[in-house]
C-alpha cells in the first residue's frame, strides 16, 4: 500500500512553493481586489464593497491579471516574503491562513476540487460589489463591509 502524500500546502512553507503552487492558493474570492480604507488612529483596515476597475464583478477574477500592474500601479502583488504582513488580508484567505499556521478551509478549490465553491458558500462578493468607477472615492466609507484582522 502506497503512503499517502500530504498536499503541497501542508508539506511546504510559503517560501518553498513554486509559482504554480503559489498562484493555486488563490481561491478566486476577489476580496483582495476590493478597495480598502485604513483607520488613521489605530491602523485597522476596512474592506469596502468597491471593486478595482479590473475585477469582473460576477466571476471575481481580474480581467487583465497578467498586465494588472501596468493598468493599476498600486495593485498589490502578494509574495512569500510578505507573509508576516498578511493580517490585512481577509481571514478566509489561503495566503493569510497558511502564513498563520492554519489549514485551508473545506470549500477551498484545492481541498474540494470545485472552483465555484467559494461563490456558493458566499465567501466571495460575486454579484455584491460595485465598480470603483461607479462610486466617488469620497463615498467609499458608506460601503464598508468588514474589518480585517
From Swiss-Prot:
Sections of the chain in a coiled coil: none
Pfam families noted in UniProt: CxxCxxCC (PF03692)
Superkingdom classification of source: Bacteria
Family according to the record: Belongs to the UPF0260 family.
Name of the protein this chain belongs to: UPF0260 protein Avin_32930
Amino acid at each position: 500500500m502506497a503512503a499517502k502524500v500530504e498536499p503541497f500546502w501542508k508539506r511546504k512553507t510559503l517560501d518553498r512553493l513554486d509559482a504554480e503552487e503559489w498562484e493555486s492558493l488563490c481561491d478566486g474570492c476577489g476580496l483582495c481586489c476590493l478597495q480598502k480604507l485604513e483607520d488613521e488612529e489605530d491602523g485597522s483596515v476596512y474592506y469596502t464593497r468597491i471593486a478595482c476597475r479590473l475585477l469582473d464583478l460576477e466571476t471575481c477574477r481580474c480581467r487583465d491579471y497578467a498586465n494588472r500592474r501596468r493598468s493599476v500601479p498600486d495593485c498589490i502583488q502578494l509574495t512569500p516574503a510578505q507573509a508576516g504582513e498578511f493580517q490585512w488580508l481577509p481571514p478566509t484567505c489561503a495566503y493569510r491562513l497558511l502564513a498563520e499556521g492554519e489549514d485551508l478551509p473545506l470549500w477551498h478549490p484545492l481541498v474540494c476540487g470545485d472552483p465555484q465553491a467559494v461563490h456558493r458558500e458566499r465567501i466571495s462578493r460575486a454579484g455584491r460589489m460595485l465598480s470603483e468607477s461607479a462610486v466617488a472615492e469620497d463615498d467609499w466609507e458608506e460601503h464598508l463591509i468588514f474589518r480585517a484582522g
